[in-house]
């Protein structure tokens, strides 16, 4: 096992290598607007997972995934050559869901803000359902009650 710091540094290096390869060396027309967002490497340095995002439709995302799968061997050999590892890690490409999740959270926050504004607008004109002063004053003592106690 390798320490986590070395695995993290190698993962960053793999991310840069893959991004550079996609930008300069791989000329597949199926590759759309691809951004390599992250790379993770297991502590035994055997498996690398590269996360990417694609700007475009679902068909473009599928075409980009196919292009990355077909270029995986070339990318892996370049990673092995440039990192100098004894065993070149296997590379798995995974589409990054973080931008979609962030967009969904922003939509939920916008809905919550709108609902809060509606509640505040309704509360500004609202009056209490009962008396304006909900606390009751003590009842005045009846004279008849005192007479009953004396008997």
UniProtKB/Swiss-Prot annotation:
Biased composition annotated in UniProt, kind: Acidic residues: 142-151
Disulfide bonds: none
Domain of life of the native organism: Bacteria
Segments of skewed composition (Low complexity): 120-129
Gene Ontology BP, a term: maturation of SSU-rRNA
Pfam family, one: RBFA
Keywords recorded for this protein, A-Z: Cytoplasm, Ribosome biogenesis
CC terms in the record's Gene Ontology section: cytosol
Main subcellular location: cytoplasm
Compartment annotation: Cytoplasm
Region annotated Disordered, chain positions: 116-151
GO molecular function list: ribosomal small subunit binding
Self-association state and partner proteins as the record states: Monomer. Binds 30S ribosomal subunits, but not 50S ribosomal subunits or 70S ribosomes.
Function recorded in the entry: One of several proteins that assist in the late maturation steps of the functional core of the 30S ribosomal subunit. Associates with free 30S ribosomal subunits (but not with 30S subunits that are part of 70S ribosomes or polysomes). Required for efficient processing of 16S rRNA. May interact with the 5'-terminal helix region of 16S rRNA.
Family note: Belongs to the RbfA family.
Protein name according to UniProt: Ribosome-binding factor A
Protein species of origin: Thermobifida fusca (strain YX)
Protein's gene: rbfA
